Amino acid sequence: MSRAGSSSLANKRPRLVSHKSESPATADTPKKELVSEAQQTASAPERNSYAPTALGEVVDRAARAALARFTFGFSPTALAECYLDYATHLAWSPGKQLQLLEKAVQQCARLALHARECAIRASETEPFIHPLPQDRRFVGEPWQQWPYNLIYQSFLLQQQWWHSATTGVRGVTKQHEKAIEFAARQILDVFAPSNFLLTNPELQQHTLRQGGMNFVRGAQNLLQDWERSVSGEKPVGTEAFEVGRDVAVTPGKVIYRNRLIELMQYAPATDLVRPEPILIVPAWIMKYYILDLSPQNSLVKYLTERGFTVFMISWKNPGPEYRDVGMDDYRTFGVMAALDAVTAVVPNEPVHAVGYCIGGTLLSIAAAAMARDGDERFRSISLFAAQTDFHEAGEMMLFINESQLTFLEDMMWERGLLDGSQMAGAFQLLRSNDLIWSRTLHEYFMGQRRPMIDLMAWNADTTHMPYRMHSEYLRNLYLNNDLAEGNWLVDGKTIALTDIRAPMFVVGTIRDHVSPWRSVYKIHLLAADSEITFLLTSGGHNAGIVSEPGRKNRSYQVKTKSPTDQYADPDAWAAATPRQEGSWWPEWVSWLEKRSSEPVPPPHMGAPAAGYNVLADAPGTYVLH
């Protein structure tokens, strides 16, 4: 927990029952509060009380929660603050205004000159401005023909001009500048020529070939998607990827359950296994089975086939009754409870701990607390796309300020949670071209359903966030950066990642919009006394991690830094580290093998003598809700 104070907004808290066995013999298992003792005296977001009954605060929060339903959770005050900061500074910057005017005149002249050349030489004219490498909207041959080449290049000029207009204004707060630039980019993308029939030659040609039936099918697709959204059903095509039948099918057993997690132990796939087990702590923002998708791209299956005993946490998808469950509860009843179970099944052996995304952040917190207290049960720590320093946490920081967090907290206060669809919507905004407008063009204008794949089906299987946990996560990590600054408390005492001595394997992905790799790289500064192997792989936050051997167009860079080596900044590291082709999974497994002992017969499933009986087959029950 960080330094925030305790919440009095929820008097009823869910209670935790630890199910080591569901047999009558454990009927007298003592119940524990799901809210840890340390948390009851530690902090949640501080709030003002306007009166002894806090009636004024309740009214204010209810009003803001009602407004949030119409603004999709975005604070109008935060947006107005950004615009006012930008507009007032731009108004008092006559030099910047002249630069923008000059740039506009120059761009108009360039466009006019290009139009003249196109009129003379038609399609032989080379474009004078190119889209960014990740922008694939205008790469088709029809876009290179007149007049569409002028249309899309005019749009790119507008993008370029607005980028200049919204950045580089002296005096504007950096976060406000980024927010204004982001908002301008989102508005421009709405009016991109690729989104309209009259200005999209590829759509025109497709419509002629289809005789207009593409719009009929697109309308049907739109209606079908709307009906499913209203009814709470998953998107079309996800039924082909049923959990436990098509995905999450690696054989295993649930050996422990409490109100927050199920712990699975996977069956061995080899006659002998490494003595040191692997405990995986996935993110709870989405479901665990991204690491156990289809058999051909399951990381869990890959590990078991290479002689490892794998344990996986499956998080409960919380309801409103979990509103006062916080980050320390996820550590106590998630990571630590699972670790106790693993060390009971495989006693006297250190554990290879693995954390993905926010699960990796939580694992870092748990590891630092264990190191502080002399708990040496971790043999190694692997972090996948997991941030520990949130100072430069990418475009997610656009949504993180006091006004926005207060607005979001009030919305969650009313419901007790953050709905999974709202989280998914925020992520979609970060990649609106790929996840919103490209889909709109193909499925609703062209009438073509994109084939559903396992990763897309998993992405549609959203989860909720408890009010207290998500508030602490955003406020104490993103806003205050408490973990990196040494202000995070566990059991009332501060923790520091510098206490960790276990070797670390840290993975960043090049196109990660959630955990930018340069932010992930900062673990070098926070855990400088550990041996750190940093690997940078192609792909994004999800596809970069699910990178099975044999997949095309995959590459990575990897280098190990010992505690005595000098620090290299991210760009210097990338320039000096050679690139290797292929999946990074074999590199990681080789790293684990070097830190593991000689193979031995596999352990039994569960530990009945310690109370960890087999409760169900994997993938368990929590993942189904």
What residue ranges belong to the model's regions?
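Amphipathic, low-complexity, repeat-rich surface-exposed segments
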Residues: 2-264, 268, 273-275, 286, ...
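Short amphipathic alpha-helix adjacent to the substrate-entry channel of hydrolases
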Residues: 292-310
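Gly/Ala-rich beta-loop-alpha elbow adjacent to hydrolase catalytic centers
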Residues: 355-359, 363
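Short beta-strand/loop motif that positions the catalytic acidic residue
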Residues: 506-508, 512
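Conserved alpha/beta-hydrolase "acid-adjacent" motif
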Residues: 513-519
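Alpha/beta-hydrolase-fold enzymes
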Residues: 162, 166-216, 223, 344, ...
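Short, proline-enriched alpha-helix->beta-strand connector loops that line the catalytic pocket
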Residues: 499-504, 516, 526-530
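Alpha/beta-hydrolase active-site loop
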Residues: 322-346
